[in-house]
Amino acid sequence: KDKTRNGILLIVDGDQLEDDADGIMDHIYIENCYIHDVDGPNDWNDTFTGGIIFNVIGSTIRPNTSFRDLRIANNTIRKVDLLGITGYVDMVRGNYQAAIGPNNLWMRDIYIGHNYMEDIGQGGIDLCDAMNAVVEYNVVDGFLKRYPSFRPTVALYPWKSENAVFQFNE
């Protein structure tokens, strides 16, 4: 369990883009997938692993680099570590909020709906750095299965997000 593994991994790497390239990745839909048996670290670390992961990375802040209109729907995710579904911006260190907005790094118009998750190492959905996201009609049947008990968590949560709607989830 010392390896970093993911079921589906989406990366926008600011370091790999040409200076004048559009860094916004639009209209990516992940639907009707079965993701299962993804082992990973079960302790707190700087690398989130799991079922469906979408990250914005880079060694420096690159404005206008992110996801827009990302849809994750009707998927089944079973026995994954650490998270069922998560996305975050990792080109900003320290005070995330201070740089996300002014540099247009928000992940915008994210939809996560109608997914079924069970036997999740930590949390079902950890949505970070998102604006105008909707998370609805998801079911998490068993979370915090292999995560150390000293670090409490919840099944679904926004982190450093604005105008995120979480509704009708179980």
Name every feature range the model reports, one short phrase each.
Residues K1, D22-D39, N64-L83, Y96-G123, ...:
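Right-handed parallel beta-helix
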Residues K1-D26, N45-P63:
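Extracellular beta-strand-rich solenoid/capping regions of secreted or surface-exposed proteins
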